Each structure stands twice: as structure tokens, then as C-alpha cells.
A protein has these predicted regions:
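A short beta-loop-alpha structural element at the N-terminal edge
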Residues: 6-21, 27-33
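Conserved GNAT-fold acetyl-CoA-binding loop/helix
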Residues: 27-53, 64, 88
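A short helix-loop-beta-strand connector motif used in the catalytic cores of GNAT acetyltransferases and
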Residues: 52-67, 84-88, 114
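Conserved beta-strand in the GNAT
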Residues: 67, 73-82, 114, 119
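Conserved acyl-donor/pantetheine-binding loop and adjacent beta-alpha core of acyl/acetyltransferases
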Residues: 82-117
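C-terminal "cap" of GNAT-fold acetyltransferases
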Residues: 97, 147-150, 154-161, 166-167, ...
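Conserved GNAT acetyl-CoA-binding A-motif
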Residues: 111-113, 125, 134, 141-152
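Conserved acetyl-CoA-binding loop-helix of GNAT-fold acetyltransferases
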Residues: 120, 126-139, 143, 162-166
């Protein structure tokens, strides 16, 4: 298998794959949130796909993604954003409890480029593609003139945690995971950061 990936900007036609990759990266939380927002009779996946396809105000809008391809086939993708400084005041009564630790860690990451989602389709894992995606992330962030990349990872996601550590990310902070309905994960959310040279 050829191991060199080609990167491009996300396209509207990628929206179905991007919805899947976002949900995989978020360990089911995106689909749960979509299920709350979806209309009666609308599937969560259909709703998420449509939001990625058409809602320019969402961070997960398809134009904000970078897509990795092998021989013209989408194998993975990522997106992120600059965390505001100063971080806006949040009324925690306005957001569900299970999002509190995520928002708290995002606040700690103020000023960095937060890698919101990065994922590879299951059939393309184990070929070293994650490292190529992370290298592309660094190029994107450096081109913006920023000096640090942050990300959040669940403590139970051992494979991702290992890849991030191996690629120079260090733990900065953590918060106790609060499960959303249907989640079986436990432990902590970990905020990791990599300073760029």
C-alpha cells in the first residue's frame, strides 16, 4: 500500500465521511448532540451531515476541514480553530453537564490552535497515516503564525494518547469525564499541547 497521503481542503461531497470521522473522533458525543437537535424522524447522522454540508457558522463546516487521500480515496481528516484570548465568559447553567470539562479545558488552551477532531477511517489505520495527519496539522498552524497546538483526548483512548505523546504532545491539564447518555467511557479528559519551533 502506498503510504504517502495527499492533502486537500474539505469539499461539500465529503460531508458524509466528515460526519462519520467527527463522530469517531468524538467517541459518539457528536451523534448524541445531533440526535438532540434533529427534527422528529430525522436521523442523527443525516442531521450532522447536513450541518457539516451547509452551516457556515459551525466550526465543523466542511470548508474548515483538511482531508487526507490515498490514491484519490478519503482515508482521514482533521479540523481545528484558534481558541479565543481572552476566553469568553461561559454560563455553565446554559450548557449540559457532560460538556463542562470540555469547555473548561478549552479555556485553558486559550491562544492555541485547538485540534478539534482528527480521525482515520478504520480500514486505513495501522499504516502510519496518523503521523502524516499530525505533520500536516503542524504545517497549517505554523502557516497561521501560531506557536502551539492543543487537543483533548479521553484517558481511555490509549491508541490516540500514545500517538500524541510519541509526536511531542504533553499533558497540560485534565478534568473528570462526565458521561453523556449512552456513553460507557470513564476516566478523565486530558488537555495536551505541543509547542512549535
Amino acid at each position: 500500500m502506498q503510504k504517502v497521503l495527499r492533502f486537500r481542503n474539505g469539499a461539500k461531497e465529503d460531508s458524509g465521511d466528515l460526519a462519520l470521522l467527527l463522530d469517531v473522533a468524538g467517541r459518539g458525543l457528536p451523534a448524541y448532540l445531533w440526535s438532540i437537535e434533529a427534527k422528529q424522524g430525522q436521523s442523527a447522522y443525516e442531521y450532522g451531515r447536513e450541518k457539516i454540508r451547509s452551516d457556515e457558522n459551525r466550526r465543523s463546516y466542511y470548508k474548515n476541514w483538511y482531508v487526507a487521500e490515498k490514491n484519490g480515496i478519503l482515508v482521514g481528516a482533521f479540523f481545528g480553530f484558534i481558541v479565543e484570548t481572552p476566553y469568553p465568559e461561559i454560563d455553565y447553567n446554559d450548557i449540559p453537564k457532560y460538556l463542562h470539562p470540555i469547555v473548561e479545558l478549552e479555556k485553558v488552551a486559550s491562544g492555541s490552535w485547538l485540534l478539534q477532531a482528527i480521525s482515520i477511517l478504520p480500514e486505513y489505520r495501522g499504516y502510519g497515516f496518523a503521523i502524516q495527519l499530525l505533520r500536516k496539522v503542524e504545517k497549517v498552524v505554523k502557516a497561521l503564525g501560531l506557536k502551539s497546538i492543543s487537543l483533548q483526548v479521553e484517558e481511555v483512548n490509549n491508541s490516540a494518547l500514545g500517538i500524541y505523546k510519541k509526536n511531542g504532545f504533553e499533558e497540560i491539564d485534565r478534568r473528570t469525564y462526565i458521561p453523556f447518555p449512552g456513553s460507557r467511557d470513564t476516566g478523565d479528559f486530558i488537555l495536551m499541547m505541543k509547542n512549535l519551533k
